[in-house]
Amino acid sequence: MKVKIISVGKVKDKGLNELINYYAKQIKTIEMVEITDEASITGMEKEGQKILSKIAKDSYVISLAIEGKMLDSVEFADTLDHVTTNFGPSITFIIGGSFGLSHAVKEKSNLLLSFSKMTFPHQLMKLFLVEQIFRAQAILNNHPYHK
């Protein structure tokens, strides 16, 4: 599985960056791309165009959105397994900025995924996502990390 995470904004907290990097190193085949946060509702469209330009044509796109489908960790692992088996090894995850994702990005997405009905800062979502990708790999490989 080849993973790309496109996120709006930078993770400024050193501790969060260390945790994100810890899990990213465990995943190995991961690329993280940061898009400049435009910090306005009108800037969301500009962010969307930048995001779309970073998505590989053969990639399965999963965007994090509050209205998306909620999965538990095992269902998430099964989804990633299904995607890589049926659509190829390339998966792109997208984390929007404070105003969310543009309509164009949501339309390009193969799956809208929600971690909760609550709203979280994009910095925390990046950590949650990287950890869940690592956990999914552990589940699929019968590794004891997932209890």
UniProtKB/Swiss-Prot annotation:
Residues that, per the record, bind S-adenosyl-L-methionine: 64, 96, 115-120
Keywords: Cytoplasm, Methyltransferase, rRNA processing, S-adenosyl-L-methionine, Transferase
Matching Pfam families: SPOUT_MTase
Keyword Nucleotide-binding attached: no
Keyword Ribonucleoprotein assigned: no
E.C. number: 2.1.1.177
Gene Ontology terms: cellular component: cytoplasm
SUPFAM superfamilies noted in UniProt: alpha/beta knot
Broad class of the protein's primary localization: cytoplasm
GO molecular function, one term: rRNA (pseudouridine-N3-)-methyltransferase activity
Subcellular compartments: Cytoplasm
Catalytic activity reported: pseudouridine(1915) in 23S rRNA + S-adenosyl-L-methionine = N(3)-methylpseudouridine(1915) in 23S rRNA + S-adenosyl-L-homocysteine + H(+)
Biological role stated in the UniProt entry: Specifically methylates the pseudouridine at position 1915 (m3Psi1915) in 23S rRNA.
Record PANTHER family: METHYLTRANSFERASE, RIBOSOMAL RNA LARGE SUBUNIT METHYLTRANSFERASE H
Quaternary structure annotation from Swiss-Prot or TrEMBL: Homodimer.
Membership in a protein family: Belongs to the RNA methyltransferase RlmH family.
Protein name: Ribosomal RNA large subunit methyltransferase H
Species, as recorded: Acholeplasma laidlawii (strain PG-8A)
Gene name per UniProt: rlmH
